[in-house]
Curated annotation (Swiss-Prot):
GO terms for cellular component: extracellular region. It comes from Conus leopardus. This is Contryphan Le925. The modification 4-hydroxyproline is found at P8. Its target is unknown, but this toxin may modulate voltage-activated calcium channels (Cav) or calcium-dependent potassium channels (KCa). The keyword Transcription regulation does not apply. The keyword Secreted applies. The modification Proline amide is found at P8. Belongs to the O2 superfamily. Contryphan family. Disulfide bonds join C1-C6. The lineage of its organism: Eukaryota, Metazoa, Spiralia, Lophotrochozoa, Mollusca. The cysteine framework is C-C. Expressed by the venom duct. It is found in: Secreted. GO terms for molecular function: ion channel regulator activity; toxin activity.
Amino acid sequence: CFISDCAPG
């Protein structure tokens, strides 16, 4: 996950 992309994947 990244700064504003904390999703399962």
